[in-house]
Curated annotation (Swiss-Prot):
Known role: One of the primary rRNA binding proteins, it binds directly to 16S rRNA where it helps nucleate assembly of the platform of the 30S subunit by binding and bridging several RNA helices of the 16S rRNA. Forms an intersubunit bridge (bridge B4) with the 23S rRNA of the 50S subunit in the ribosome.
Gene Ontology MF term list: rRNA binding; structural constituent of ribosome
This protein's name: Small ribosomal subunit protein uS15
One GO CC annotation: cytosolic small ribosomal subunit
SUPFAM superfamilies: S15/NS1 RNA-binding domain
Keywords: Ribonucleoprotein, Ribosomal protein, RNA-binding, rRNA-binding
Pfam families with a match to the protein in the record: Ribosomal_S15
Organism listed in the record: Neisseria gonorrhoeae (strain ATCC 700825 / FA 1090)
Database matches in PANTHER family: RIBOSOMAL PROTEIN S15, BACTERIAL AND ORGANELLAR (PTHR23321), SMALL RIBOSOMAL SUBUNIT PROTEIN US15M (PTHR23321:SF26)
Keyword RNA-binding applies: yes
Family in the record: Belongs to the universal ribosomal protein uS15 family.
Gene: rpsO
Record bears the keyword RNA-binding: yes
Amino acid sequence: MALTVEQKAQIVKDFQRKEGDTGSSEVQVALLTFRINDLTPHFKANPKDHHSRRGLLKMVSQRRRLLAYLRRTQPDTYRALITRLGLRK
């Protein structure tokens, strides 16, 4: 199921740096993480859905690039974000 407008607004509100911030790396990573987590049950039920799997892999790659950028430019923000999202065990 796709993110609803309300869910997306709540995620943006939770991760924004300041009021009106919708495009910062933290917000983008959070949105991608929730979309990725939302697709996981779909692939358990539909293991042969390769077309959607390609979209999932694109999202994972985009999130990886954004996290690498954050790690390189703002290490403290990166550590706080991965802890908050439960990434990197």
